[in-house]
Swiss-Prot record:
Its main location: membrane. This is Potassium/sodium hyperpolarization-activated cyclic nucleotide-gated channel 1. The keyword Protein biosynthesis does not apply. Disulfide bonds: none annotated. 3',5'-cyclic AMP binds at residues 533-534, 536, 543-544, 584, 587. The gene is HCN1.
Length: 880
């Protein structure tokens, strides 16, 4: 070359099209321009390097040291196609292996097991296809489409079309035969499932032997390219050969019918089920839809085959005069009309409703009709059986409910229950089970702990959201509490709890309205989110009120054992329950020595820390806010009650002395045992008054507490049970008025109105009590000074009025109870009223007045009506 050295003979050029162009020396006399033109160098480039645009290779046509760079460039370009080929090979190989997806994870158990299965496919041999691979999935989908097309189109083409050489028909047959031949080859390289061990067989020799023994003969015969042979020999054959070809096509149709394999259909159903899970479809609904479509499709396909067979048999006989086609003069009609009549005849036979347009006359039609009836009866029985099982599986819980209620109806008929009771039982089952029965406890027990807790929290999410106690509690405590709940339903008028019964459960209202019935005329309503009955669980006492369902109530109950089991693990929540219970009792002027002793013990041991103190403050604050929300509503009624006359009975004329107010800093441990100087004088009664102790430590006695107290609803949406006393019959202003002696007879007309003063406040007759003395409730052991008179409202379980011991006075009436009879009640000391969270100080504006010598101390009127803003401040949390 002129002006340059020889080109590097070892360097070759290779573009991205995987073509290699060796650099050849130019011919003699060609000149450098020709060589540069062949190499793609622009003219006039001289000794400059030539470079093609795009992905071409750079060349150095200069002599000297450019040979090494040219060689390196050629090797790099050669690696590109190799990497591309390796990438394609890896992608195709991965399609032959099972992928890591939801279906494979469910089949093999874990991702590691799937990876192990992938390694088995790699080591099994070349072109071994896993039965759960993506490639096999898409291939089976193509085969399904081809099978449906063949099973529908080929019978119609063979039966109703004489010309088999049209272009669409040839294309369809060629394509289907090619696909079936490829499927025949792939079946030798596809792993099979071992039915005994459910393991995928990947050994080529075992796969080949299993396929040869099972479906190979049927697939090979049905995959013979009859259409190809027919196209080759068609021109050299006469009409007789054409008839032979038609007979071969019939054989082809028979072979195609054998291609419908249950294994492929079942595998397809599994894939469809996998898609349904991916799209978050319901399992029952999805499986039911698939089964319905499979059943309907099978019935329609059998009717289609039978219709083609009805016309094919006369066709093979060249339409004899006694066949149904000739009798109906349909030999030369269009194929659509012929197919319609044939299908109608087939469906009439299969459904056993007739013989179609024409009754069978010839022997061949007779046998075809009997065959159709047998097949139709079998299919009809299968259809009815599958449909029945399908309907039952769609809603098994409703079916169980119907079976259960039939047993209930038989039970009611056997015992001859009245109609109203039967209606109540029917309504209970409707509201309790709502038409479905399932063993929820068994279902939850079969789940693991995280899933079970998640379900319980979801089911009770609205209940938790409406309860302040749960809002400030530990989430683990809430979960443990909810997992112990038991669902119950009560009808309107049902007593959920009864007064005087031993408390074994507490209740949480999910939906409904319940009323708290006390011995007074006032009632409290409980709605969604409220709970009640926890005080008896804490004190192991008896119910002090009855709760009756006003509407259908859906409740969650918690037994005392489960309650204590949960609170043992969360002592702070037990103290929270006890704090709320003390606060509630104190707001109605009652106390419980068990709760007070526990609280005093915890206070002395110093278990209350700052964090727990803040939590208890919030809980008590929520409970008090609900009481304050209902207090303005009840204030006018209670004011009217306060303004009425109180001269109905001697006990109602007793005044209440306002005890002095003590601050929290003035209380100490020594105050618990230091008696007040003004109360050290013994009382004439055999029972010493608990108010012989300081008023900062104990509360003054209350006259007829059970007859003058009632429950009040805390808030229209409250979740707490608030207890509020009614106002006493006399206002606080005339407290300094001297008390009349109890022996003064009752003045006619001076009694309070019937709707304001309870009937139990009337004077006792001179005779003895109507019933024996009822023991004090175990849930209120700290109230020996609180006595009850006759109660107008009877106990729910007793049809008579109850009697209790009246308050002892200095001068006992000659016909009243003797002091010796009252001395059997043990003396009890009320502990530390100031420490209770609900202790609201009395009105400081009224100075205390000394009581008459013959009259015991009285508790002042309900502190709920106290309008002093300082008195309404909660003092419990500050004492913690």
């Amino acid at each position: 070359m002129e002006g340059g050295g020889k080109p590097n003979s070892s360097s070759n050029s290779r573009d991205d099209g995987n073509s290699v162009f060796p650099a050849k020396a130019p011919a003699t006399g060609a000149g450098p321009a020709a060589a540069e033109k062949r190499l793609g160098t622009p003219p006039g480039g001289g000794g400059a390097g030539a470079k093609e645009h795009g992905n071409s290779v750079c060349f150095k046509v200069d002599g000297g040291g450019g040979g090494g760079e040219e060689s390196a460039g050629g090797l790099e370009d050669a690696e590109g196609p190799r990497r591309q080929y390796g990438f394609m090979q890896r992608q195709f190989t991965s399609m032959l292996q099972p992928g890591v997806n939801k279906f494979s994870l469910r089949m093999f158990g874990s991702q590691k097991a799937v990876e192990k299965e992938q390694e088995r496919v790699k080591t099994a041999g070349f072109w071994i296809i896993h039965s759960y691979s993506d490639f096999r999935f898409y291939w089976d989908l193509i085969m399904l489409i081809m099978m449906v097309g063949n099973l529908v189109i080929i019978p119609v083409g063979i039966t109703f079309f004489t010309e088999q050489t049209t272009t669409p028909w040839i294309i369809f047959n060629v394509a289907s035969d090619t696909v079936f031949l490829l499927d025949l080859i792939m079946n030798f390289r596809t792993g099979t499932v071992n039915e005994d061990s459910s393991e995928i067989i990947l050994d080529p020799k075992v796969i080949k032997m299993n396929y040869l023994k099972s479906w190979f003969v049927v697939d090979f015969i049905s995959s013979i390219p009859v259409d190809y042979i027919f196209l080759i020999v068609e021109k050299g054959m006469d009409s007789e050969v054409y008839k032979t070809a038609r007979a071969l096509r019939i054989v082809r149709f028979t072979k195609i019918l054998s291609l419908l394999r249950l294994l492929r259909l079942s595998r397809l159903i599994r894939y469809i089920h996998q898609w349904e899970e991916i799209f978050h479809m319901t399992y029952d609904l999805a499986s039911a839809v698939v089964r319905i479509f499979n059943l309907i499709g099978m019935m329609l396909l059998l009717c289609h085959w039978d219709g083609c067979l009805q016309f094919l048999v006369p066709l093979l006989q060249d339409f004899p005069p006694d066949c149904w086609v000739s009798l109906n003069e349909m030999v030369n009609d269009s194929w659509g009309k012929q197919y319609s009549y044939a299908l109608f005849k087939a469906m009439s036979h299969m459904l056993c409703i007739g013989y179609g347009a024409q009754a069978p006359v010839s022997m061949s039609d007779l046998w075809i009709t009997m065959l159709s009836m047998i097949v139709g009866a079998t299919c009809y029985a299968m259809f009815v059986g599958h449909a029945t099982a399908l309907i039952q599986s769609l809603d098994s819980s409703r079916r169980q409910y119907q079976e259960k209620y039939k047993q209930v109806e038989q039970y009611m008929s056997f015992h001859k229950l009245p109609a109203d009771m039967r209606q109540k039982i029917h309504d209970y089952y409707e509201h309790r089970y709502q038409g479905k029965i399932f063993d929820e406890e068994n279902i939850l027990n079969e789940l693991n702990d995280p899933l079970r807790e998640e379900i319980v929290n979801f089911n009770c999410r609205k209940l938790v959201a409406t309860m302040p106690l749960f809002a400030n509690a530990d989430p683990n405590f809430v979960t443990a509490m909810l997992s112990k709940l038991r669902f119950e339903v009560f009808q309107p008028g049902d007593y959920i709890i009864r007064e005087g019964a031993v408390g074994k459960k507490m209740y949480f209202i999910q939906h409904g309205v319940a009323g708290v019935i006390t011995k007074s005329s006032k009632e409290m309503k409980l709605t969604d989110g409220s709970y009640f009955g926890e005080i008896c669980l804490l004190t192991k006492g008896r119910r002090t009120a009855s709760v009756r369902a006003d509407t259908y109530c859906r409740l969650y109950s918690l037994s005392v054992d489960n309650f204590n089991e949960v609170l043992e693990e969360y002592p702070m929540m037990r103290r929270a329950f006890e704090t709320v219970a003390i606060d509630r009792l104190d707001r109605i002027g009652k106390k419980n020595s068990i709760l007070l002793q526990k609280f005093q013990k915890d206070l002395n041991t110093g278990v209350f820390n700052n964090q727990e103190n803040e939590i208890l403050k919030q809980i008590v604050k929520h409970d008090r806010e609900m009481v304050q929300a209902i207090a303005p509503i009840s204030y006018p009624q209670m004011t009217a009650l306060n303004s009425t006359s109180s001269t109905a009975t001697p006990t109602s004329r007793m005044r209440t002395q306002s005890p002095p107010v003590y601050t929290a800093t003035s209380l100490s441990h020594s105050n618990l045992h230091s008696p007040s100087p003004s109360t050290q004088t013994p009382q004439p009664s055999a029972i010493l008054s608990p108010c012989s102790y300081t008023t900062a430590v104990c509360s003054p006695p209350v006259q007829s507490p059970l007859a003058t107290r009632t429950f009040h609803y805390a808030s229209p949406t409250a979740s707490q049970l608030s207890l509020m006393p009614q106002q006493q019959q006399q206002p606080q202003a005339p407290q300094t008025q001297p008390q009349q002696p109890p022996q003064q007879p009752q003045t006619p007309g001076s009694a309070t109105p019937k709707n304001e003063v309870h009937r139990s406040t009337q004077a006792l007759p001179n005779t003895s009590l109507t019933r024996e003395v009822r023991p004090l409730s175990a849930s209120q052991p700290s109230l020996p000074h609180e006595v009850s008179t006759l109660i107008s409202r009877p106990h729910p379980t007793v049809g008579e009025s109850l009697a209790s011991i009246p308050q002892p006075v200095a001068a006992v009436h000659s016909a009243g109870l003797q002091a010796a009879g009252r001395s059997t009640v043990p003396q009890r000391v009320t502990l530390f009223r100031q420490m209770s969270s609900g202790a609201i100080p009395p009105n400081r504006g009224v100075p205390p007045a000394p009581p008459p010598p013959a009259a015991p101390l009285q508790r002042e009127a309900s502190s709920v009506l106290n309008t002093d803003p300082e008195a309404e401040k909660p003092r419990f949390a500050s004492n913690l």
